[in-house]
Amino acid sequence: MFGPQLLHVDDPGGGRSGPVSKIMRRRPAQAQLPRIAADGRGRERRPQRNSRLEVVAASYGLFTKRALGASTKSGTHFGTSTRASSSPLSFANAMWQDGWMAADSEHKSISARALGIALSAAALVPHFTTPAFAHASERGYVMLLPTGYYVVGGAVAVAASFLVLAVLPPRLLERISASRLPIGQFGDAARIWISTLAFAVLAILVAAGILGSRDPLSNPLPLTVWTLVWVGLTLLQGVFGNVWSWTNPWYGPWRIFSSVFPAFRDRTMPQGLAYWPALILFASFAWFELIYPAPEDPARLAFALMAYWLSTFVCMIIFGYEGWSRRGEFLSAFFRMVSRFAIVETTPDHPSEGRALSLCWPGAKLWSAQALPASGMLFLLLTLSSVSFDGLSKTFSWLGANGVNPLEFPGRSALVGINSAGLVLMFIALVAVFFAAVFVGERLAGSISFGKAVGLLVWSIVPIALAYHFSHYLTALLVNGQNALVAISDPFDRGWNLFGTAHMNVGAGVIMGSDAAWIIWNFQAAAIIGGHILAVLVAHGLAFRLHPARSRAALSQFPLTVFMVAYTVFGLWLLSTPTAV
């Protein structure tokens, strides 16, 4: 299986025995860390970064003493080995090598491989306590749960969903997709004010990025961009609909501008551009988030946001707000696609008209979606491939395959070339496999409408992309969401406490310990499995639009279901495999 049972060791701080499942790189529960005396400005200083993980650095000796005893069969003493005595890093390398040697030792109840990884990570953590400009997804723990059962079970569940859907009558799916429950109406005036307020908040955050703390965990700009917007708002879009259409920082300023200069109000975007601008911009965003060495540096992020907001506003003036927000501005295009999975529907979807709200089944709006052009298909597949590569790029397997010792992680700067190539290759591989699955399915069904089929069936990627987004960023959202609450009370690092949260203890314990590990893993695994099952359901509903005959529709979906089963296994493996950061 992919992981052994949880290890139990003594807690060096309290003497209590408990399972060890995670090792945090970032901010632990501050309740365990005494605050330092007031600084020159009369406010409390936060603990220095180098002291945050003292307990982890000090505990690896107890790990070895408890788990392995005084020696192994080979006579190597982990606690006093010459290789392990010079530094935590050399100790980590010793664990990396000796962990495999102990695989056939007398300790049959503990997987030596997983133990070596866990001890190595514990020894390595102190070497990464300096400020790290990474992005929100770094989970920094080693999963030691018996995850192989979940992988097999998830694959079986997705495959079984195909068999169940293959015998369902098409009319049942049509009734489900068409059912709506009206819940009210609203006008558009409030949207202008909310968007204008969002623009003002963005301006304050940009100023905080330039003038505030350089610590990404203390500055509200990177926490807002990478945690609250990119993680939290994406999930809100998938549940409640297109919230971004109200909260984006362009709509209000554009309405004000177009009222002053009405000649620009009815501009349209050329159809030939399709989704290519959004595709290019999202590829740049993904590279900045995943590859660029310092995406969380507040000042750099602030200047990047200023340039992007201004260039986007100019494009909206030239091409019209509606056209550019649908197919040019990548966040709006992505959020609009994701919102098709939501349980809330707004109609009509036009900025100048009132809207009616109604409830629907999750994913029901995807069944009525129109086929995407080639650029739209590539855009949607890129959103999934980028988050998938983000998980892959941190794994021991990826780093080892590229000649990088995962226990001596050199940092992003040394991996720019490798990871840039990997990001492109992951995208190409996903496109090739998805297109091949649709092509083979259409041939099996006796159809030659490949272009229309792939443009329609690509909408089934939306539930998978949402599931990966949730699972991949869950731990970051739980911890960095708290950091954001702290940072917004003192955006300029002046000792303020605007909202009463500046001195709030950030509880990393919410994701630490055996109970938390078990709960989080089950949520993540359930999201991955559930997302793929819903993707199979959406694909079947779309297939009936292409092939009214139930047998042909089911036959066309067989290769795509195989692809989704394989991607389920891949996603669960990404969650369970050891990572370097």
Residue ranges and their predicted role:
Residues 134-136, 256-257, 396-412, 483-511, ...:
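Membrane-interfacial helical/loop segments at transmembrane boundaries in membrane proteins
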Residues 113-114, 146-153, 184-196, 222-230, ...:
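Alpha-helical transmembrane segments and their helix-start/interface "positive-inside/aromatic belt" motifs
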Residues 259-465, 475-478, 482:
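Long, contiguous internal "core" modules enriched in hydrophobic/ aromatic residues
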Residues 571-581:
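Juxtamembrane boundary at the C-terminal end of a transmembrane helix
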Residues 119, 123, 138-142, 149-356, ...:
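Transmembrane-helix bundle segments that line or gate the permeation/cavity pathway
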